[in-house]
Amino acid sequence: MIKQKLNVISRFKLAHFSGTLTYRNCQLANIKMKHYKNIFVGIFFVLLFVIATLATWVYSQIDSALPQLEGKKTLFGLSATATVERDEAGIVTIKAKNRLDVAVATGFVHAQERFFQMDLLRRNSAGELASLFGEAAIDYDSDIRRHRFRERATTIVKQLPKADSDILKAYTRGVNQGLKYLKAPPFEYLLLQHEPVEWQEEDTILSVLSMYIDLQYQDGKRERTLGLLQSTLSAEVYDFLNPKGSRWDAAIDGSQYPASPLPKAPWPSASSEELTTLMQGNTVQTALNTLIPDILSREKSPQSEEFPGSNNWAVGGNISATGSAIVANDMHLGIRVPNTWFRASFEYQSKHQKPVKITGATLPGTPNIIIGSNGHIAWGFTNSYGDWSDVIVLETNADNSQYLTPEGYQPFLKRKQMIAVKGQEAVDITVTDTIWGPVIGKNAQGDLLAYRWVAHDTTAVNMAITELETATNVEQAFAIAARAGMPAQNLMVGDNQGNIGWTIMGPIPQRSKAFGEVPTSWANGEHQWQGLLPAADYPKVMNPDDSRLWTANSRVIGDDMLAKVGNGGYALGARSLQIKQNLNAKNSFDEQALLDIALDDKAKFLLRWQEFLLSKVLTTEMLAKNSDWQEVKTIISTDDLAATKDSVAYRLVRNFRLNVRDQVFDIFNENMTKLDEDFSFHAIRHQLEIPLWQLVNQQPENFLWRGHDSWTALFEETLEKTLAEMTEKSSLANATWGKQNISKIQHPLSRAVPLIGRWLDMPEVELAGDSYMPRVQGKSFGASERMVVSPGHEERGIFHMPTSQSGHPWSPYYGVGHESWVNGEASSFLPGPVAYTLTLLSY
């Protein structure tokens, strides 16, 4: 009994001890949990504090990168006080004592608003993008470095006339002070973790050289492509694919050239032995499987119809509402955020102490008004597409160490180049030069090729365009154009006396004889450049009888004048012809009438393709075979074919044409690419409309590729493909042109970091317009501005452009004006009421 009690007591004590131990363990666990919780809470708040601090710092840095809009700043280089006025859209009016002070103030404003854009321009032509973006840009930089543009820019700066040099120095002072006075570097450098580098005088030259790269071939691509065709195809097939003229030509001198006739021989027998050998022993499909990737994928989409250029036109005072000339201009470029141009007005005293007031568009990186009006003249540009370069076939010795010149064999000049690369060691490359220019590669026969290009000359860039600001008539503008250093453009100019004129503005090479379409040897001295064309010999047209002038990147003149300019790859003349027809449709014009021409989206070019579909494809037999196609016929049976946002018919006819083109030429394109990877279908695609139309109408069976039984089968397959593409995401009735042509206007950094796109990019909207009509408009390509102005009547003028003045997303006018551009509204050419005033004081 006693023993049992002791056992009970023992078990009780043990249980009590165990309970106490468990309780204490629980207490310890709770203490530990509270301790860990406190640690976690502490860490959370520390992280929150760090994130908040970092966010505050980032916010502060971005906010501090905004330009100063009001107040006072003291600038070195000003001779007197200057003011910078901005309206609500950020359009700048600079008022200063003289042109040099305007240059200082312009540099200051450009740096504060657009320095990152300026930086990209100079790095683009210098081949220095890899130091900003890393290894992704090494290949591009290596390609560009062969031009040695930074060295050339430095040389140009040293030999500029004093007046040009003074403006360049003043602008550079303004840029660096504008950058310095930002409280933080432009926000892009924060994202790139890079410090901006100060502006140098040669950087302005590099900015213009970047426009050469944009507007001319930096690699001779088109000439090399034509050279391959000429060496590979029979003469009649080559002429067929490279016609001199077409029904679309609308030259201002009325000159016309016929298209080449359809060759008698089909593709295979018309081709050289080399091309025939390519296909021997292979079925078509085997050949396709072994071909290298299509060059198109490395250039543009095969169906890209973008054509860097522009429209401009003018009417004389005798048919204008103002009595002065009226000039219209829209320059077609790739569009991104911010826009290429920066709007400004300058007010100052000329060197003759006369008041100057000029309004227009500037290019950040340069101190000039590029297009605009000064009360006496108004002017605009389109890309000329003359022949401003030559590819030279080098005759080398056995080991390719020397090349033949008129003076005998000479050694190649090798130059080392170092490419700085962000985040890794620099890359060393070697560029090879000749007396004519850099070596750019080899042709299909293995010959080395050199490149002679006006952009390599010391005359390529100068500040002569500044003189347009004080020109008072068309003749003075012509004289300035002939000595200007810039990518050669079609200058359209009108004055307040009602005169209008066209000429080339920029350097024109003077060749020893007619040549330049295809690569040629210069070894015997027969082919050479003999300096630049004298000013007196520049082609020009002034005051035509009908008081109307127009250009749109196609051939402008013929005969002797054309021989001076050459053909560097003209656009098909459809846009030019439509502008001409619109000008001839009226007897008098005001500014709105000319803007209406700029906004014309009628698809006159595609009318014959519309009729072709209706009469040759959607036949009774074809409709019986494909009953669903009755809807197609109903849709495209419209009397008003236009690239409007709601048009299904336009999208269908347009895409059918492009798919037919690609079906007809695809094997040909692939064969040429196999022979030479530098072959560029993209460079010749516009001229192929002429032979394409002959082929689809004459339908020679021996010109069919890819195993089609007949042309009818090709058209049927192409229409099926077109409809399948259009109905992939919607019914055919809802597959409008606007659904395909949706804007994609982005900041360069948002492409790399999509998350910031909503913050930086313009809204995606459906757009009217397309190629082959005045209203040129693609997803991220089109009219970089539209201007209509009559000199002396600027208050009636019209100007709008995509994106906005600002490059900073927190700017009060970021995106302001973009909607006017989308809708084609007649917004004012002149700045509006002053909203912000900044006073710049001199030391």
Residue ranges and their predicted role:
Residues 484-586, 656, 660-664:
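Hydrophobic alpha-helical segments
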Residues 656-734:
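Charged, long alpha-helical assembly modules
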